[in-house]
């Protein structure tokens, strides 16, 4: 079986639970070789974001050229892009290098509520990046921002917004329903072939730092092994649930701790 080379394009997390660090752990845990392009240096920990240093867009583009000119990239995850010019740089390089199997985690806010994408960049992301990617993974506030619409409060409103996002041109949409006030956490997958509901009981832990990053990285790592997004989502969600179930065994930070990416090993 051909080895999988996976790329993450995202910001950093020195505490190791989110961003590039979480993505590379996820790739390794799921048997993919990880490459990375850094868009922002983020001073953050389990308690919140303290500072963000955005990388110059030309240097983001240079990193992408370095990877794509040398390494066969089978799958890509995009996370924090921070600002308009970085979104433009990434969109242009994806087009230039004919990149496939791209999962876009529409990162706008950290778990702590701190902003990770400038408001002006949302339109650029919507117009330049969405039509190029294979799958987007918005939560309900992110979906509302992309659609310039009110936050979905019911599963029916969530369905309507997922269909509207799919119409923007991406191959598939995974709407994450964690913000709904239900005992279970329903997610909906929208593709050109149809719609599929995924639901599981909420894991009883406060340690959920980096779950969005981790899920999108898992989806990217697993996609080349499956025939459909439905199969990919099913395995990625099962793996993430196990990582969440073991999160309390870690002793990381004073705030919202990370999931246990290597729960299968230690």
UniProtKB/Swiss-Prot annotation:
<dbReference type="GO" id="GO:0005829">
    <property type="term" value="C:cytosol"/>
</dbReference>
<comment type="pathway">
    <text>Cofactor biosynthesis; thiamine diphosphate biosynthesis; 4-amino-2-methyl-5-diphosphomethylpyrimidine from 5-amino-1-(5-phospho-D-ribosyl)imidazole: step 2/3.</text>
</comment>
<dbReference type="GO" id="GO:0005524">
    <property type="term" value="F:ATP binding"/>
</dbReference>
<comment type="function">
    <text>Catalyzes the phosphorylation of hydroxymethylpyrimidine phosphate (HMP-P) to HMP-PP, and of HMP to HMP-P.</text>
</comment>
<dbReference type="InterPro" id="IPR013749">
    <property type="entry name" value="PM/HMP-P_kinase-1"/>
</dbReference>
<keyword id="KW-0067">ATP-binding</keyword>
<comment type="similarity">
    <text>Belongs to the ThiD family.</text>
</comment>
<keyword id="KW-0547">Nucleotide-binding</keyword>
<dbReference type="Pfam" id="PF08543">
    <property type="entry name" value="Phos_pyr_kin"/>
</dbReference>
<dbReference type="InterPro" id="IPR004399">
    <property type="entry name" value="HMP/HMP-P_kinase_dom"/>
</dbReference>
<dbReference type="GO" id="GO:0009229">
    <property type="term" value="P:thiamine diphosphate biosynthetic process"/>
</dbReference>
<dbReference type="GO" id="GO:0009228">
    <property type="term" value="P:thiamine biosynthetic process"/>
</dbReference>
<dbReference type="GO" id="GO:0008902">
    <property type="term" value="F:hydroxymethylpyrimidine kinase activity"/>
</dbReference>
<keyword id="KW-0418">Kinase</keyword>
<protein>
    <recommendedName>
        <fullName>Hydroxymethylpyrimidine/phosphomethylpyrimidine kinase</fullName>
        <ecNumber>2.7.1.49</ecNumber>
        <ecNumber>2.7.4.7</ecNumber>
    </recommendedName>
</protein>
<keyword id="KW-0784">Thiamine biosynthesis</keyword>
<comment type="subunit">
    <text>Homodimer.</text>
</comment>
<keyword id="KW-0808">Transferase</keyword>
<dbReference type="GO" id="GO:0008972">
    <property type="term" value="F:phosphomethylpyrimidine kinase activity"/>
</dbReference>
<comment type="pathway">
    <text>Cofactor biosynthesis; thiamine diphosphate biosynthesis; 4-amino-2-methyl-5-diphosphomethylpyrimidine from 5-amino-1-(5-phospho-D-ribosyl)imidazole: step 3/3.</text>
</comment>
<feature type="binding site">
    <location>
        <position position="44"/>
    </location>
    <ligand>
        <name>4-amino-5-hydroxymethyl-2-methylpyrimidine</name>
    </ligand>
</feature>
<dbReference type="InterPro" id="IPR029056">
    <property type="entry name" value="Ribokinase-like"/>
</dbReference>
């Amino acid at each position: 079986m051909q080895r999988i080379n996976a790329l993450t394009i995202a910001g950093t997390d020195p505490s190791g639970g989110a961003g590039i660090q979480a993505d590379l752990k996820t790739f390794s845990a799921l048997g993919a070789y990880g490459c990375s392009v850094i868009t922002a240096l983020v001073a953050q920990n389990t308690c919140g974001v303290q500072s963000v240093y955005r990388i110059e867009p030309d240097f983001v583009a240079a990193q992408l050229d370095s990877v794509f000119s040398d390494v066969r990239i089978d799958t890509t995850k995009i996370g924090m892009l921070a600002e308009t010019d970085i979104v433009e740089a990434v969109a242009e390089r994806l087009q230039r290098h004919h990149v496939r199997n791209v999962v876009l985690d529409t990162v706008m806010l950290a778990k702590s509520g701190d902003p990770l994408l400038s408001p002006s960049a949302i339109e650029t992301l919507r117009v330049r990046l969405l039509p190029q990617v294979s799958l987007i993974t918005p939560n309900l506030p992110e979906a509302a921002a992309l659609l310039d619409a009110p936050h979905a409060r019911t599963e029916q409103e969530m369905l309507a917004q997922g269909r509207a996002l799919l119409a923007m041109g991406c191959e598939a949409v995974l709407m994450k329903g964690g913000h709904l006030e239900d005992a279970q956490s329903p997610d909906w997958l929208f593709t050109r072939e149809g719609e599929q509901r995924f639901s599981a009981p909420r894991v009883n832990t406060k340690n959920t730092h980096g779950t969005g990053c981790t899920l999108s990285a898992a989806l990217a790592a697993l996609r080349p092994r499956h025939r459909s997004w439905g199969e990919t989502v099913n395995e990625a969600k099962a793996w993430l649930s196990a990582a969440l179930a073991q999160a309390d065994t870690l002793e990381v930070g004073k705030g919202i701790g990370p999931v246990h990416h290597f729960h299968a090993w230690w």
